[in-house]
């Protein structure tokens, strides 16, 4: 005889990826009364959209396109600066290690990298940053500017203005520890593992931009003034490395002319499809 009993599903969902897709999915689930775990390996939410400024043709913020996200008008706020919802727990610097179980009852092991800074103590004063001896290319600015090994969690600033440590480049010299007025820095921090139970998993892992370096005929990374579309976005952004002025990375001068190269990475023997977006944003 067949057993018709159905195991009750966990009323919680894990959303992997805190870009605009993950944020939108998380908000809609949370507004439906479901507990949401929103995880991302980056130290901030927003993904690639955070690097983009105003959208064509109305010059609006891309994050505003998901509003309203709540039935309560007074709860609306700019998602570019942070996310706050009672049913959403944000798990940043976090990756999925293992998934076990079945639909309706998953057990997920998460690994969270240390930030090196106690957020409850950090005031965001920035006293630690100038004394850091390490400078590396800023991933957020696509290498157009540099940052320290200890730097703001969100490059644009947010409601959470705390700092984090890049342990891949930190020398553990302790200069930031001595400078911190609130004893918020812990250089000896270790990764943390956590197991959560969820009924479903949403994969909103986003995309990775094509690496144009192997296409040597275009001179990307060989010539400083050959840049990608995302790098141009950062140059044109008011909060970018040139404060919105289109300047050549080589000498900081305004270019007299600009050439757009389309279909880099597509329409090749390896990728014979059309990129579908580059013509639009070039125009």
Question: Can you say where each PLM-predicted feature lies in the sequence?
Answer:
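N-terminal Rossmann-like FAD-binding beta1-loop-alpha1 element of flavoenzymes
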Residues: 12-37
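Short amphipathic alpha-helices and their capping/turn segments at secondary-structure boundaries
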Residues: 25-33, 191, 235-255
């Amino acid at each position: 005889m067949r057993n018709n009993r159905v195991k009750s599903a966990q009323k919680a969902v894990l959303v992997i990826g805190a870009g605009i897709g993950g944020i939108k999915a998380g908000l809609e689930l949370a507004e439906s009364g479901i507990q949401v775990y929103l995880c991302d390996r980056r130290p901030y939410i927003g993904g690639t959209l955070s690097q983009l400024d105003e959208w064509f043709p109305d010059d609006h913020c891309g994050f505003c396109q998901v509003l309203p996200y709540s039935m309560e008008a007074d709860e609306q706020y700019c998602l570019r600066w942070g996310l706050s919802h009672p049913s959403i727990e944000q798990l940043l610097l976090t990756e999925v290690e293992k998934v076990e179980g079945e639909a309706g009852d998953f057990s997920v092991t998460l690994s969270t990298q240390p930030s090196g800074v106690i957020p409850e103590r950090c005031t965001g004063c920035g006293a630690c940053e100038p004394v850091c001896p390490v400078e590396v290319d800023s991933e957020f600015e696509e290498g157009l500017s540099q940052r320290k090994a200890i730097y703001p969690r969100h490059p644009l600033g947010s409601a959470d203005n705390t700092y984090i440590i890049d342990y891949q480049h930190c020398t553990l010299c302790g200069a930031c520890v001595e400078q911190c007025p609130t004893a918020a820095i812990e250089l000896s921090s270790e990764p943390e593992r956590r197991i959560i139970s969820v009924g479903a998993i949403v994969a909103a892992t986003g995309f990775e931009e094509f690496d144009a370096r192997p296409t040597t005929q275009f001179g990307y990374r060989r010539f400083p003034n050959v840049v990608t579309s995302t790098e141009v976005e950062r140059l044109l952004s008011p909060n970018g490395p040139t404060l919105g002025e289109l300047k050549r990375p080589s000498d900081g001068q305004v270019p007299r002319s600009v050439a757009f190269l389309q279909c880099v990475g597509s329409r090749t023997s390896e990728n014979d499809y059309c990129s579908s977006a580059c013509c639009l944003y070039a125009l």
